Amino acid sequence: MLLAIGGWNDSAGDKYSRLVGDSEARKKFVEQAVAFLEMYNFDGLDLDWEYPKCWQVDCSKGPDSDKENFAAFVRELSEVLKPRKMLLTSAVSPAKRVIDAGYDVPTLGKYFDYISVMTYDYHGQWDKKTGHVSPMYHHPKNSDPGFNTVGFLIKLLLALSS
């Protein structure tokens, strides 16, 4: 069983940015999180910060340093969790602009045990027409340039992680 932190509502504001941006705060968090995980016999930690640099999908809100600081935070957590045989996982954005702005994909790929890509809500009530919630491929009649597909995302992440 994993303990998850974050989520849409919990990611509002700058608290995660302040955490990852302060090396002492990161160290304290890692120590306290590991103690909590061990005390309650969790198998690991799932990070669901939505999203580094692009707080709740708005890439103008967070500092550019979130990308590097989040990667450092993940590395530091992994270095403590792995020797304890605990998992470190994350839920990440499927949006290209959020990935480019907020994630150091090669570093995250190295330190996360699993990454769950939130490949849903590509389309919804906010669109002026019906679309697949999680399309695998671009439909030729779709005016979207094709970034909003699971197929595009997987190719992008594989290319970035190489």
What does each of the following model-derived ranges do?
Residues 1-5, 45-47, 88-90, 115-117:
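Hydrophobic faces of well-ordered beta-strands that scaffold small-molecule active sites
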Residues 1-37, 65:
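Glycan-recognition patch characteristic of GH18 chitinases/ENGases
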Residues 16-19, 46, 136:
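Generic hydrophobic, helix-prone segments enriched in Leu/Val/Ile
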Residues 21-39, 96-107, 152-153:
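Short, acidic/polar
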Residues 52-162:
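Substrate-binding surface in catalytic domains of secreted glycosidases
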